[in-house]
Amino acid sequence: MEIKKLLSGIKVGNCETCKNENCNGKLNYDSLCSNVNYLKEYGEQNYEKNRETFKELKKIMGEQKPAIFSFGCGVGFDYIGATENFGSKVIYYPIDECRWAIMDTENYKNFEPKLPKRIIKFNDGIMLLSMTPNNAVLCFFNSLFTISQNTDLKNKLLLALKSKNNFYFVCDFTVNNNFHLPTVEQDFIYDLLKALKIKFTFKKFDILDGKGIIILGNKR
């Protein structure tokens, strides 16, 4: 995927000289300049990581069809990785509280391959998750730390997952500005599985050279 096509023709400032404290060196969802500079730096590598994760998930799921819940989906690059591995008719729910400014540009709307046009709010995503009995895939790509620290994620997932026949929990551990956060995320996952183990058995698969994990939960 060529990220440069998405950014082509969009003129933005230089972070090294910009004096805007709300944007300079930070990811500000409402700022097109911030969006573009972030995607220049991280967009391609995030896409590659997501695609590799879905490749591993495909090996585990085989011919089963996933219902993907992408928590903290951003601009939805993981949707492309999902369709490349599971086909264009994959069920995909882009869940985020913030809509990126770049999503309202013609570049985004006309980008090929297609990117998500809508964003589902967190509580609505949890509701849809609770209504999906089989093969729900909960994806947290660089997002589990932030979401778990700012929402009642654990309790909401416990309620949504308790009636499932099976589910997949997919996490690429978060790394921000060389500050590693996987310990917090690993603790969250451990606590979640501990609370669910009375109803489910689990199988774990390390991915991305230990920088991520896929967990299959099957009802007892």
PLM regions: where:
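N-terminal auxiliary segments of SAM/dcSAM-dependent transferases
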Residues: 1-24
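Class I SAM-dependent methyltransferase Rossmann-like catalytic core
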Residues: 26-60
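Conserved SAM-binding loop of SAM-dependent methyltransferases across substrates and taxa
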Residues: 75-87
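Class I SAM-dependent methyltransferase SAM/SAH-binding core
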Residues: 84-116
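S-adenosyl-L-methionine
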Residues: 106-132
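A short SAM/SAH-binding and catalytic strip from SAM-dependent methyltransferases
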Residues: 136-151
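Conserved beta-strand signature within the Rossmann-like core of class I S-adenosyl-L-methionine
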Residues: 165-176
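Class I S-adenosyl-L-methionine
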Residues: 184-220
